[in-house]
């Protein structure tokens, strides 16, 4: 049986850190920024770590 392919859409959106955690960017940033507060826009600039409860599901999608 051939290897499972990684989900290409997900590969482009996340990075795996050296310790195996999953890093992702904040959502709701691409447009309609005038309706958001300065604080919301500033805090969404930085990437954040994915929640632990999502690790198992996402690691299965990006296995190599």
From Swiss-Prot:
| GO biological process entries | translation
MF (Gene Ontology): structural constituent of ribosome
Keywords from the named record: Ribonucleoprotein, Ribosomal protein
Pfam family of the protein (one): Ribosomal_L35p
Asked whether the keyword Ribosomal protein is assigned, the reply is: yes
Q: Which InterPro entries match?
A: Ribosomal_bL35 (IPR001706), Ribosomal_bL35-like (IPR021137), Ribosomal_bL35_CS (IPR018265), Ribosomal_bL35_sf (IPR037229)
Q: Mind telling me which GO cellular component terms the entry cites? A: cytosolic large ribosomal subunit
Entry-linked PROSITE patterns: RIBOSOMAL_L35
**What family is reported?**
Belongs to the bacterial ribosomal protein bL35 family.
Specify the protein name: Large ribosomal subunit protein bL35
Provenance organism: Mycoplasmopsis pulmonis (strain UAB CTIP) (Mycoplasma pulmonis)
């Amino acid at each position: 049986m051939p290897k499972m392919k990684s989900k290409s859409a997900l590969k482009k959106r996340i990075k795996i850190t050296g310790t195996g955690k999953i890093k992702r960017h904040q959502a709701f940033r691409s447009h309609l920024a005038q309706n958001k507060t300065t604080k919301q826009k500033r805090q969404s600039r930085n990437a954040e770590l994915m929640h632990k409860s999502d690790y198992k599901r996402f690691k299965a999608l990006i296995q190599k």
